[in-house]
Amino acid sequence: MTNGVPALDDILERLHVVALPMRVRFRGITVRELALIDGPAGWGEFGAFVEYEPPEAAAWLSSALEAAYRPAPAALRDRVPINATVPAVSAERVPEVLARFPGARTAKVKVAEPGQSLADDVARVNAVRESVPVVRVDANGGWSVDDAVEAAAALTADGELEYLEQPCATVEELAALRARVDVPIAADESIRKAEDPLRVVRAHAADIAVLKVAPLGGVARMLDIAAQIDIPIVVSSALDSSVGIGRGLLAAAALPELRHACGLGTGGLFVDDVAEPRVPVDGCLAVEPAVPDPARLAALAAPEPRRQWWIDRVCACHALI
């Protein structure tokens, strides 16, 4: 280990690359590729999305190495409430999706999907409202300020929204929108993809901070950022496997205060996972690490060209840590 960073050869000896098929298209993908590290302290997950270049993906590798090689922080709770995650499916498919989140009292609904209309979003959100009392929406920065104002009005015509997650792309747009709508604004990409993750908070551009462990560099780094934020925090998944979900649960469990359900229920989006799928009980997940099953690792192993691509990526990111 050099300067606290494990040796590259040791990491590569412990590496497994998997391809997880998804039930529905999510973030434009139908197969989720990622690398897992079987480390001395536990399993780590490196799942930076394939379009991310090494300077951005390096934080995700740091998160994986933290999980694999360093002791975990203490948890303050043994269960974490989660939201159901509803992709940009038709309203007719909403019951099928929600069935995978038993007991969930909060749902996050994807909106502003390219190729879809605001009417599609309204129909999907209203279908969710029939089964789940608390609804939040996530636009992934897909609206302009004016579009977001229109969408907020349409999406609240038949019921309240808990918040709009990343309705616009920039901090300036979020601040402008926050002054024009009554629905709370949550920031995600404006935190995890920013050089200064605290800028959106200092700019009073958000009411809620959505924090994701892997993009921020690990649980310790996420908790450090959380300690500097004076607005409520929601811990969310970056489309993680059960291994990454375990780290998100640990981070949420280590927060002094947790007012909102967390976005850590995305395991239901996979056809298969590297460990036994986590099933919510009364809308909560137990705080415990996931240990991949060897048979599942073998069955879900990525083809050799993709394995080599991930090995090359680990090497490139390791050089930047």
Swiss-Prot record:
One example GO MF annotation: magnesium ion binding
Reactions performed catalytically: (1R,6R)-6-hydroxy-2-succinyl-cyclohexa-2,4-diene-1-carboxylate = 2-succinylbenzoate + H2O
Pathway in which this enzyme or protein is active: Quinol/quinone metabolism; 1,4-dihydroxy-2-naphthoate biosynthesis; 1,4-dihydroxy-2-naphthoate from chorismate: step 4/7; Quinol/quinone metabolism; menaquinone biosynthesis
Assigned keywords, A-Z: Lyase, Magnesium, Menaquinone biosynthesis, Metal-binding
Cofactor(s) it depends on: a divalent metal cation
Positions of the catalytic residues: K110, K212
Binding site for Mg(2+): D138, E165, D188
Single biological process term from Gene Ontology: menaquinone biosynthetic process
Enzyme Commission number, as recorded: 4.2.1.113
UniProt KW DNA-binding keyword: no
Similarity comment: Belongs to the mandelate racemase/muconate lactonizing enzyme family. MenC type 1 subfamily.
Purpose: Converts 2-succinyl-6-hydroxy-2,4-cyclohexadiene-1-carboxylate (SHCHC) to 2-succinylbenzoate (OSB).
Protein name (record): o-succinylbenzoate synthase
Organism name: Mycolicibacterium smegmatis (strain ATCC 700084 / mc(2)155)
This protein's encoding gene: menC
